[in-house]
Amino acid sequence: MYGLEFNIIRPSNPYGARQNPYGTLGSLSVFLGKISRKENIQIWGDGSVARDYIYVSDLVKAIYSAAITEHTNQIYNIGSGKAYTLNQLLIKIRDVLKIDFNVQYMPSRPCDVPNIFLDCQLANKNLNWYVEIPLEEGILRTWDFIKK
């Protein structure tokens, strides 16, 4: 394996069509699933934890670009480069879908990392890769999939 060329992809929080809206992972899809079933959305803590969300098709394009690039032996962060708190995410969902829903705040969990967002400048530079699907459009696409 000596001399093997590689690239490592470090995705942020991917979401999108075909993600399980009935599970417990993937806050955006889980929130939309609960909204579609008219269930309360549960937030652990005060909703201030922040994450970097990336639509799945943008992630796939980044992976493909990393597989074919001449810039090898790199670690590429793949995300939007923007962090949204859970409260901000809920506001975005409400604004985009024009739907009201109930949120239930639960006691915080010690395992939740306060902030996760990635610097994707190396992927932008070496892979000529950029996010194409803004969060608002990604919410709509995911919602359309769940409603089918």
Which residues fall in each region the model found?
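Amphipathic terminal alpha-helices
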Residues: 135-148
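Conserved beta-loop-beta element that borders a ligand/cofactor-binding pocket
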Residues: 1-17
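Helix C-cap/helix->beta junction micro-motif
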Residues: 1-2, 37, 97
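Generic structural signal for alpha-helix termini and adjacent loop/cap motifs
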Residues: 34, 38, 66-70, 126, ...
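Short aromatic/basic micro-patch
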Residues: 8, 53, 83, 117, ...
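Catalytic Tyr-x(3-8)-Lys segment
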Residues: 45-49, 127-131
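Glycine/proline-rich active-site loop of Rossmann-fold NAD(P)-dependent oxidoreductases
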Residues: 14-30, 39-40, 44, 48, ...
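Conserved C-terminal active-site "lid" loop/helix of NAD(P)H-dependent oxidoreductases
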Residues: 56, 75, 88, 109-130, ...
